[in-house]
């Protein structure tokens, strides 16, 4: 089945949804995989542009609001840690945790940033 992700803020339906992240569209190429809702839904990009991705559904399902999108085949121009992640990391270290699990690691700098913020108070696990 065909499915579109785009920047159009209109409510989604069975044929398309809004993905409000132009940086993802800018980095996509045909053949890239998109994993939605922790990989429960899988899409393959057939065609794309600066504001859309036309995809083939390889594993279907229902997409509800604010589900995560992972692009495992593409290095995205995004920081590994959001402002909230940095705050949460500091709080976790203050609690005395032993390990921090860093998701969606794309570059060595992502781990370096987390390690610098942890300042030796916790080990980093890349996943």
Where are these regions (language model features)?
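Non-catalytic helical/linker scaffolds that mediate oligomerization, partner binding
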Residues: 1-127
């Amino acid at each position: 089945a065909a499915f579109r992700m785009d920047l159009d803020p209109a409510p989604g339906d069975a044929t398309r949804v809004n993905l409000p992240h132009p940086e993802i569209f800018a980095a996509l190429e045909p053949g890239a995989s998109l994993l939605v809702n922790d990989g429960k839904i899988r899409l393959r990009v057939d065609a794309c542009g600066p504001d859309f991705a036309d995809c083939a559904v390889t594993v279907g399902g229902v997409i509800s609001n604010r589900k995560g999108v992972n692009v495992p085949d593409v290095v995205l121009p995004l920081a590994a840690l959001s402002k909230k992640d940095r705050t949460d990391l500091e709080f976790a270290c203050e609690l005395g945790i032993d390990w921090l699990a860093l998701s969606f690691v794309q570059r060595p700098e992502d781990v370096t940033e987390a390690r610098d913020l942890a300042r030796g108070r916790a080990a980093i696990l890349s996943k």
